[in-house]
Amino acid sequence: MIKIDFAGGVLKNRQELDMRILDILHENAEHLGVSYESTDIPGKLGTLIRKAMAKYGQRAVVLVDEYDKPILDNIDNPPIASEMREGLKNLYSVLKQQDANIQFIFMTGVTKFSKVSLFSGLNQLTDITISRDFST
């Protein structure tokens, strides 16, 4: 499982977001016992997914906790919120690209998918917010 968690702390700019993402990817690589040579975020995530699948013989499961928090933390500053949206799109676009290597993706957040333009590449999202099958 690859876990991407934005729940902790407040990210104030794109540089902080990118650093957090790089830290998260590094932690996942260590946990899964894989390495990568890529230097950019999409390359690192793509390689992490592929190498995890190759090592464990199973397609990856990706958990994204609070997928929209970096945007919502900056909602009162539209230019920064826009930078955060672009940074997250840079990350999430890899998930569509790696579809063949991913079993499923589970995302939590506050905003409805259709209200956030992060997922133009992901066309198979299912909102289970009010589904009885997933209630506790």
Where are the language model's segments positioned?
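Phosphate-binding site recognition
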Residues: 1-136
